[in-house]
């Protein structure tokens, strides 16, 4: 698995409830840009429309060697999932406070571009502070153990 981009803020800002691997419909120049790791997914999110899932704000830069028919960097892209997975995700999103965000863009073993999407629920500010405290404590503990050994 060749990881192209990861949205690291997802783990900090949200509690991950479940994850799904989805295919994505891309143009040729978008695939070439992905292979060059020219993608940004900081503000990306997934919406359901007409029993299909669409990813918004996934910025794939224009391929510099492409012809005049280059793609739009922020175009809306369709995600490919099984019908029962789409129904499950759409049912979960109807519940309050649950969002779907792309967490990872990668190429699988067969060379196909995939997006790992996550069903998430937003963390409260005190949860984020708690996570920071726990992370700092682990670092300090590791430093102390390293120094004492």
Curated annotation (Swiss-Prot):
Protein family according to the UniProt entry: Belongs to the SmpB family.
HAMAP family reported in the protein's UniProt record: SmpB
Keywords from the UniProt entry: Cytoplasm, RNA-binding
Organism ancestry: Bacteria, Pseudomonadati, Pseudomonadota, Alphaproteobacteria, Rickettsiales
Task performed by this protein: Required for rescue of stalled ribosomes mediated by trans-translation. Binds to transfer-messenger RNA (tmRNA), required for stable association of tmRNA with ribosomes. tmRNA and SmpB together mimic tRNA shape, replacing the anticodon stem-loop with SmpB. tmRNA is encoded by the ssrA gene; the 2 termini fold to resemble tRNA(Ala) and it encodes a 'tag peptide', a short internal open reading frame. During trans-translation Ala-aminoacylated tmRNA acts like a tRNA, entering the A-site of stalled ribosomes, displacing the stalled mRNA.
Annotated S-S bridges: none
One annotated GO molecular function: RNA binding
GO BP term, example: trans-translation
Annotated localization: Cytoplasm
Gene Ontology terms: cellular component: cytosol
Organism of origin: Anaplasma phagocytophilum (strain HZ)
Gene: smpB
Protein name per the record: SsrA-binding protein
């Amino acid at each position: 698995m060749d990881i192209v981009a990861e949205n690291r803020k997802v783990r900090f800002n949200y509690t991950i409830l479940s994850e799904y691997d989805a295919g994505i419909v891309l143009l040729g120049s978008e695939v070439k840009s992905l292979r060059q790791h020219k993608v940004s997914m900081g503000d990306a999110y997934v919406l359901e429309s007409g029993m299909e899932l669409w990813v918004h704000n996934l910025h794939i830069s224009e391929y510099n060697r492409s012809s005049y028919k280059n793609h739009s960097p922020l175009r809306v892209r369709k995600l490919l999932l099984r019908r029962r997975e789409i129904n499950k995700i759409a049912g979960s999103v109807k519940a309050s406070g649950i969002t779907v965000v792309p967490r990872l863009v990668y190429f699988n073993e067969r060379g196909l571009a995939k997006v790992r999407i996550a069903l998430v629920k937003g963390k409260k500010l005190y949860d984020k502070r708690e996570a920071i405290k726990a992370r700092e404590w682990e670092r300090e503990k590791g430093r102390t153990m390293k120094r004492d050994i």
